């Protein structure tokens, strides 16, 4: 579980230049917040929606606010892509993810592959488990999709995970759904067909797929349950 610092409520005016969002606070002031998400944010960036910001007082920060959550009709949605790695690691450490509970050592951001870093590496006497974590927010008719934009980086990760399996290690693609209203996970073949086909290939070659959603409110976010997937 990760607890938010006190969040500030506002109304989204617009997201622009990918990393910025203008928000009208409840006191009427308009602020520019950092948007910690490089994706298209389809289905979770509608203007006039209620959003929640964290505030940071570090003197070196140009933007004092960070956009954390948005209220959509059927769920709060977490937009901060820095959250999934932290939440998944904490959940693994607390043995909350049964598929990833057999380990003696856990590390983050370990170099591997071709100039890459694996999000989480689990180790025991018998095997290394390489875990790549992806943030998922795109929802259409109850199905959560990844990616929400073409991703060459994501494609590279799938290829590197397959190489780890070939070398005798375990590899896992972990899709964290930062919302509570998804019934299933699927690769977004209508957005990035190349990634979708590579995910199918990776699965056939032994890369495991896990999709979990969260419980989320304005005080905290916690891992919730395993969600079925369809390739």
Where are these regions (language model features)?
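Short aromatic-glycine-enriched beta-strand elements
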Residues: 17-22
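Conserved catalytic cores of phosphodiester-cleaving nucleases, focusing on short active-site segments
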Residues: 10, 118-148, 161
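OB-fold/S1-family single-stranded nucleic acid-binding modules
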Residues: 58-75
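Nucleic-acid nuclease catalytic cores
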Residues: 142-152, 162-191, 213
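Short nucleic-acid-contacting surface segments enriched for D/E, G, S/T with interspersed K/R
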Residues: 39-52
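Short, charged beta-turn/beta-strand-edge "cap" motif at the junction between a beta-strand
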Residues: 14, 55-60, 177
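Acidic-basic catalytic patches of nuclease active cores, encompassing PD-(D/E)XK
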Residues: 42, 74-107
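Domain-level recognition of nuclease-like catalytic cores that cleave nucleotide substrates
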Residues: 178-231
């Amino acid at each position: 579980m990760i607890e938010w610092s006190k969040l500030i409520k506002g109304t989204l005016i617009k997201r622009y230049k990918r990393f910025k969002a203008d928000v009208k606070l409840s006191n009427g002031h308009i602020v520019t917040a950092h948007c910690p998400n490089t994706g298209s944010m389809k289905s979770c960036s509608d203007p006039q929606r209620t959003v929640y910001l964290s505030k940071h007082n570090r003197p070196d920060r140009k933007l004092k606010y960070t956009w954390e959550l948005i209220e959509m009709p059927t769920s709060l949605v977490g937009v901060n892509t820095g959250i999934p790695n932290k939440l998944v690691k904490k959940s693994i450490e607390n043995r909350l993810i049964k598929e990833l509970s057999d380990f003696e050592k856990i590390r983050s951001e370990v170099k591997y592959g071709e100039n890459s870093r694996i999000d989480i590496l689990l180790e025991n006497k018998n095997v290394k488990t390489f875990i790549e974590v992806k943030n998922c927010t795109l929802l259409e008719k109850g199905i959560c999709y990844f990616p929400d934009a073409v991703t060459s980086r994501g494609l590279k990760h799938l290829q590197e995970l397959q190489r780890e399996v070939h070398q005798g290690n375990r590899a896992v693609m972990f899709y964290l759904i930062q919302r509570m209203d998804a019934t299933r996970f699927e690769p977004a073949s209508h957005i990035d067909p190349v990634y979708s086909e590579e995910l199918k290939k990776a699965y056939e070659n032994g890369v495991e797929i896990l999709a979990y959603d969260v419980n989320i409110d304005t005080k905290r976010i916690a891992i919730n349950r395993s969600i079925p997937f369809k390739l």
